[in-house]
């Protein structure tokens, strides 16, 4: 076998391989012998068909199959010999085959980039220093009460946390536009559902009033004909409602799984959940900064084949989220996912190199701790832990999570890490 390797462009490689004629003929003869043992041809007993008859009837197809097999096996031998690491599926370019002559073909593919980590000492990471305070727990309890609130009619003017029922008609340059009219539209204020200025125009008005507000559609608004346009909305305010928050009664508290129904028990449960969320948020904040610094410090070439593969993964995930199928997934424009796919590949290659250079392996104690932490959010943690322990795929996924954490810690060990006092709300809003 003769092998030559050339660089086509960037990470592209072209391997040219020549297979000796006698290797081909020996492989063809060997395969014809195997075929002769199995075929049935009229006039001959099974296994007793003369080789010349077998060769005449099956020779062409056997030779084609043998060539395909030899091409694959010789390519594998070639990349092992040349110590080449292909990325993605290779493209075979057959040469002209002539009976009794050596056969030359080419294989085109991309290789993984040679990654040499640098700039780790220049990475800057701010570690949030934050704790769950009594005030944070109070705020969360208020949120829980608001989620369970009922609505009652309000005589006064509408404000930021009220709910209103309105009729409205919108116009641009005196002309009504599609989608700009509604009757008995119920709007919970303060949730940012409407364009800027719409809710502000309602505040201060009472039920029974009719008024006009002036707003401007954002430049990034989805309807092309309304982007950046000034508009007027005639509004009939039919009803104003305010929240009636439930009291922290024993019955209310037990809805949240607090068996003793006490306020102290609810506060303890809420604090525990907030601290679990906080731990994850701190970890994610540190991780995202470390990875961002790693990517910025290491500009590497990325094989197009890996990006294409990641785009397919993202397409399928997007289709699944919206109830689509495989065909619909492949129809989604690749431009929607290209930037994210490239970044994921880059991060994977860089963290893979961190793992390789530090000879990291998943810490089983860490894996166990991660599973226990995740399971603590469920009603029966032991059931979740047992489910994971019996599922090899889930366990492998958790080992990958642990290994990624260990790689990030290896980056942080060389990075400049400073502590930054932060509030619970500030950190959680950064995660949103």
Curated annotation (Swiss-Prot):
Signal peptide: none
Reactions catalysed according to its record: [protein]-peptidylproline (omega=180) = [protein]-peptidylproline (omega=0)
Native source species: Cronobacter sakazakii (strain ATCC BAA-894)
Broad class of where this protein is predominantly found: cytoplasm
Domain notes for this protein: Consists of 3 domains; the N-terminus binds the ribosome, the middle domain has PPIase activity, while the C-terminus has intrinsic chaperone activity on its own.
Family statement drawn from the similarity comment of this UniProt entry: Belongs to the FKBP-type PPIase family. Tig subfamily.
Record function comment: Involved in protein export. Acts as a chaperone by maintaining the newly synthesized protein in an open conformation. Functions as a peptidyl-prolyl cis-trans isomerase.
Gene3D superfamilies with a match to the protein in the record: 3.10.50.40, Trigger factor ribosome-binding domain, Trigger factor, C-terminal domain
Group of enzyme by EC: isomerase
GO molecular function: peptidyl-prolyl cis-trans isomerase activity; protein folding chaperone; ribosome binding
GO cellular component annotations of the record: cytoplasm
Keywords noted in UniProt: Cell cycle, Cell division, Chaperone, Cytoplasm, Isomerase, Rotamase
Residue ranges of domain PPIase FKBP-type in the record: 161-246
EC numbers for this chain: 5.2.1.8
GO BP terms: 'de novo' cotranslational protein folding; cell division; chaperone-mediated protein folding; protein transport; protein unfolding
Protein name: Trigger factor
Pfam families for the chain: FKBP_C, Trigger_C, Trigger_N
Keyword Calcium: no
Subcellular location: Cytoplasm
Gene behind this protein: tig
